[in-house]
Amino acid sequence: MTKEPRFKILITNDDGIKAKGISLLVSLLRDANFADLYVVAPLEEQSGRSMAFSLIGPTAVEPFDYPQKVQEAWAVVGTPVDCVKLAIGELFKDNPPDLVLSGINNGKNSGRNLYYSATVGAIREANLHGIPAIALSQCENISFFQEAQMSSLIRALCEFTVSHKHANPLGFNVTFPASSDNSPWKGIRFTLSGDEFLFGIPRLIRTEGNRRYYTLYDMQDKVSEDLSDEYLALANNYITAVPLISKNTPLATLSEEELAFLKESFEQSVQWDSSLNFEEDLA
C-alpha cells in the first residue's frame, strides 16, 4: 500500500518563536500527523511590522532547540518576512515548503488590520514566491483559542489551500472569534475582508530635551455603519477565512465567477463537523 506523501510545512509567526500561539499550532499539526514541520520564526516579537524586512542591515539566524518535535527550528533576528525569505531562499532552497503557516497570532488581524499585520505579511511573502499560505489569528487573546476538533479543521484548511488550483498561489487570512463566555465556535465562514481597522490616539508619555515620546491609547475598532460579513461572522462566533490572491491587490485576479467557485469549493471541503448549522442567519 502506497503511503500518501506528507506535506512540508514552514511555520512562522510575529509574536516570536517562544510564543504560545505558535506552540499551539505545532501541537495541532502534530496531532493531525499529515506534514513534516519546519519552524523559522522571529527571536523577538514583531507585531505590526507588516511586510517589513531587513533591507539596510544584516539579519541573523541560528538553530533553535524547539520544545516540541519538529524537523528543524530556526530563530531569526528579524521580521516574519525575513523568516520566509531566509527559509525559501537559503535554509530550504533545494526543497521548498508546500505551504507556509503564520500564527497563531495573539490578537485579531481581521478587516483592514491585515495590512498592518506581520502575521499576514509572512503569507504575502510566501505567495510572492509562488507558495500557498495561511495566516491564523485569535481575537482578543490566545487564551480564547479552543483546541477541541481544531486539528481536523487545520488539516482541511491546509489541504484545500495547497490543492486548489489557480493561476496564482492562494492565501487565507483565518481569524478565530472570542466571546465573553467562551462559547463553542459555530463553524467557519468564507468571507471577504471587512473595512474595520484598529484605531488609536497618540498620547505624549514623556519629553527628553527636544525629543517627545508617544504611545497609542484608546485602541478600538473603527467600523462603518454597514458592517462587513467578516465582522458579523466573528461577532456571531464563527471562524472566518478571507481569501488573499496575490498579484498586487487582494482578489485582483479573480472574476466574480471564479470567486463564487472558490467559495463553493471551500464550503464543501473545509468543515470539521457536518452537524453544525452553517446556514444560521447572522442578523
UniProtKB/Swiss-Prot annotation:
Keywords: Cytoplasm, Hydrolase, Metal-binding, Nucleotide-binding. InterPro entries: SurE, SurE-like_Pase/nucleotidase, SurE-like_sf. One of its GO terms (molecular function) is nucleotide binding. Belongs to the SurE nucleotidase family. It is an enzyme of class 3 (hydrolase). Its EC number is 3.1.3.5. GO terms for cellular component: cytoplasm. It catalyses: a ribonucleoside 5'-phosphate + H2O = a ribonucleoside + phosphate. This is 5'-nucleotidase SurE. Its main location: cytoplasm. It comes from Chlamydia muridarum (strain MoPn / Nigg). HAMAP family: SurE (MF_00060). It comes from the Bacteria. It is found in: Cytoplasm. Binds 1 divalent metal cation per subunit. Its cofactor is a divalent metal cation. Gene3D superfamilies: Survival protein SurE-like phosphatase/nucleotidase (3.40.1210.10). A divalent metal cation binds at residues 14-15, 47, 105. Nucleotidase that shows phosphatase activity on nucleoside 5'-monophosphates.
